[in-house]
Amino acid sequence: MKIVDIIPISRGINKNTLSYFTIHDISAGAIVKVPVRGRTINALVVSSRPAEESRLELKNSAFSFKKTSSIVSQDLLSAPYMAAAKRSADFHAASLGSLLFSIVPKIVLENAKGLATAKAPERKPESLHGAILQTDDDERFSNYRSLVREEFAKGKSVFLCLPTTSDIRRAEKLLEKGIAEYSYIFHGLTKKKDFISSWNALAREPHPVFIIGIGQFLCVPRHDIGTIIVERESSRTYKSQTRPYTDLRHFAEMYAKETGAKIIFGDTLLRTETVWRYREDELREIVPPSLRVQTSAESQVIDMRKTRESEAKFDPISPALAEIIKNSRERSERLVLFASRRGLSPVTLCADCGTIVACKRCRAPIVLHSKANERFFLCHRCGEKRDANEKCVSCTGWRL
């Protein structure tokens, strides 16, 4: 008989470890079913020892030890995965059990007995090779395709971690060219039958694979992962909204440390803390990061002076904008109007020579305001205020 120390994989149970006895030879990392508070739950075995070594503990115990119900899986979670989970639990000031409950998908725990496992190799020396990739989407995914082919040539697999299912579907379309044969998709909407089939096929595939999934599926049975890519790194979805508030980006980094894999953080705009780490030389760059956001949106400048000349009544909205609003309402589309106007007029210019009236202190365009029958110019940059009764500084014209 043996005594096993287990961690319940369930919320609401704060004890770090519970002890049970068993007649089976169960090793650390196994998933077993145990009775807790009148219900049977999954639990993770963290240690196992012969009962003879715990005679005094058993004799002096104020309660009787319960027996484990059954073994779900002997090697479902690998030693590197467990070590990463322990480090992440310490970082989040949470128990290992509650953290595992948040990072291991429910579908994995419920179907653990029918899932194939793979023995993890001996732990590699810890060496984190981190990098950032801050560019537009097209360039990032082009780099990902090249990286996957490079890793395949080295006999290594790649895990592309994404925050949501919609992101996974989009990435699948962008990356399917040339590597679809060895690609495996895992997300929360996968049906049970398809999930078990994909999981077991992944475990048996001798060729390196490309895995696209949410962060919870880092527990897949592949121990040849050479690169972990955290795409859309700035997404808030990576962090859980309930206790223990797990940040999957941190767990992915800890897992990369335990397995010796490279980790890449990619996004159009990375988080401030990630950019800081890059500037402190903690992370390297794959390509020089783009510091400007490129947009494909079409810009159009409309001259309202022609509209005002042709219409007797003043209208702040141009006919072109009115048509866009009308079409959006007819198609039930969303439309955002952003108006940056402050004062009576954000810009005042000379009708004769076109010179813009500027602040005399900082040379920024000055804004016309009105208060109690008084008109004045106010600079919104430096705060200078002056009377609006003036002439053009360029041509001395009075038509401002």
Residues covered by each model-derived region:
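Accessory, non-ATPase domains that flank or precede helicase/AAA+ motor cores in DNA-metabolism machines
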Residues: 1-312, 326-330, 335
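Cys/His-rich short segments
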Residues: 316-321, 327-400
